[in-house]
From Swiss-Prot:
Gene source species: Coxiella burnetii (strain Dugway 5J108-111)
GO molecular function terms attached to this record: glutamate-1-semialdehyde 2,1-aminomutase activity; pyridoxal phosphate binding; transaminase activity
EC number(s) given by UniProt: 5.4.3.8
Annotated keywords: Cytoplasm, Isomerase, Porphyrin biosynthesis, Pyridoxal phosphate
GO-annotated cellular components: cytoplasm
Primary subcellular site in the record, as a coarse category: cytoplasm
Pathway: Porphyrin-containing compound metabolism; protoporphyrin-IX biosynthesis; 5-aminolevulinate from L-glutamyl-tRNA(Glu): step 2/2
Species classification: Bacteria, Pseudomonadati, Pseudomonadota, Gammaproteobacteria, Legionellales
Gene name, Swiss-Prot/TrEMBL: hemL
Top-level taxon in the UniProt lineage: Bacteria
Top enzyme category: isomerase
Cofactor: pyridoxal 5'-phosphate
One Pfam family from the record: Aminotran_3
Similarity comment: Belongs to the class-III pyridoxal-phosphate-dependent aminotransferase family. HemL subfamily.
Known catalytic reactions: (S)-4-amino-5-oxopentanoate = 5-aminolevulinate
Name of the protein described by the UniProt record: Glutamate-1-semialdehyde 2,1-aminomutase
């Protein structure tokens, strides 16, 4: 029963568009009643109807330590006692910035903002200001926040301008946004051949987290770095999802590629609203007040967010933190795949440390956006609701990644696998494929 959630959702729709403050939370992609959460602890969520869920959303990525981690709660509580916002610098800004740079050596200087969208938007403005160029390249299926210039669908071909993907985005705003195919270096090279003197930057998720989960091929990222070097453009890694999750040094450390700028968010706030962007010293020095490129924010460097983020990053230095997290992720994903195979369920998966994507498809590997969108969304919807009914909370969208935290133990993972095995064993025939 979800009586209280249903009542709250009905009430919320009177006051908020769709009853939510971020569209995916409304369950529009899966149907049904979104769960209103009352409490979260470790790997669990508890909704207003007192139902407990094993959580694989993790607030969409920030909760790498699990919910209500004692060190993070203590740091936030201590910060709150000293005030909620100063509108002035605080010492923890310096400490967090230094730790970010220690973990990610490509970030020689960093600017704190309030969200991942602010981080990517500001990084692109900086890239344009530094290069004196206007065009950017993004990739079909990669999501970089809701800034106008990034809400773009691919055009009809590699050499066409993008088209707005939302009403309210002026056509003129996106005509400087070029779209290419993720993991297809030739599509990027073609854009450089035509617009070489106009391209300020490439922005890319090194592991794309919003077309389910698709890692970049190593030679693809190497090729992007080489093209940027060749044409004098900047390479921007959007590591809002992957930063400090897939490795202490982010995805850039796994690929051993040094971007010019990096956008961060989620984990660096420990659950508080936060974002950041940083990179090469000479580029970051072009930001106001040192340089001419303007960016500011009333709540940037918020003392509570800085304290929570600093406490979170310190926990990531624990011995075997990432090896343990990777082991749990692999245990979960490989367990799901083996059970799907045994039940003849058409399912594939991609995963990295602490993050995974499940796609209902008979294709063995998914490396492109076109493959991801051809996954069976109806199968996912059925699977999602069966999991939810059995106390497992997945992202309510077939195209969103799942997250696992340090608080998840083999107990939660194995319980999840038992639930999945039962679901697959009794699933409707339309979920099955022939041998």
């Amino acid at each position: 029963m979800v009586d209280h959630s249903a009542a709250l959702f009905n009430k919320a729709q009177n006051y908020m568009p769709g009853g939510v403050n971020s569209p995916v939370r409304a369950f529009g992609a899966v149907g049904g009643v979104p769960r209103f959460i009352k409490k979260a602890s470790g790997p669990y969520l508890i909704d207003v109807d007192e139902k407990k869920y094993i959580d694989y959303v993790g607030s969409w990525g920030p909760m790498i330590l699990g919910h209500a981690h004692p060190a993070v709660i203590q740091a936030a509580q201590e910060a709150v006692q000293n005030g909620l916002s100063f509108g002035a610098p605080c010492e923890n800004e310096i400490k967090l910035a230094a730790l970010i740079g220690e973990f990610m050596p490509s970030i020689e200087k960093v600017r704190m903002v309030n969200s991942g969208t602010e981080a990517t938007m500001s990084a692109l403005r900086l890239a344009r200001g530094v290069t004196g160029r206007s065009k950017i390249i993004k990739f079909e299926g990669c999501y970089h926040g809701h800034a106008d210039c990034l809400l773009v669908n691919a055009g009809s071909g590699a050499l066409t301008f993008g088209m707005p993907s939302s009403p309210g985005v002026p056509l003129g705003t996106v005509q400087d946004t070029l779209t290419a195919t993720f993991n297809d270096l030739d599509s990027v090279a073609a854009l450089f051949e035509k617009y070489s003197k106009d391209i300020a930057a490439i922005i890319v998720e090194p592991i794309a987290g919003n077309m389910n989960l698709i890692p970049a091929a190593p030679d693809f990222l190497t090729g992007l770095r080489e093209l940027c070097n060749q044409y004098g453009s900047l390479l921007i890694f959007d590591e809002v999802i992957t930063g400090f999750r897939v490795a202490k040094g982010g995805a850039q450390s796994l690929y051993n590629i040094r971007p010019d700028l990096t956008a961060l968010g989620k984990i660096i706030g420990g659950g508080m609203p936060v974002g950041a962007y940083g990179g090469r010293r000479e580029i970051m020095n072009q930001l106001s007040p040192e340089g001419p490129v303007y960016q500011a924010g009333t709540l940037s460097g918020n003392p509570v967010a800085m304290a929570a983020g600093l406490a979170t990053l310190k926990e990531l230095t624990a011995e075997n933190f990432y090896s343990n997290l990777k082991e749990k992720t692999e245990r979960l994903v490989m367990g799901i795949l083996s059970r799907a195979k045994a039940a003849k369920i058409p399912l594939t998966a991609n995963f990295s440390c602490g993050v995974f994507g499940l796609i209902f498809t008979s294709e063995e590997r998914v490396t492109r956006y076109a493959q991801a969108v051809n996954g069976n969304v109806e199968h996912f919807r059925s699977f999602f609701h069966k999991m939810l009914d059995n106390g497992v909370y997945l992202a309510p969208s077939a195209f969103e990644s799942g997250f696992i935290s340090a608080a998840h133990t083999n107990k939660e993972v194995d319980k999840t696998l038992d639930i999945i095995e039962n679901i697959f064993s009794v699933s409707e025939t339309y979920l099955r494929i022939s041998v």
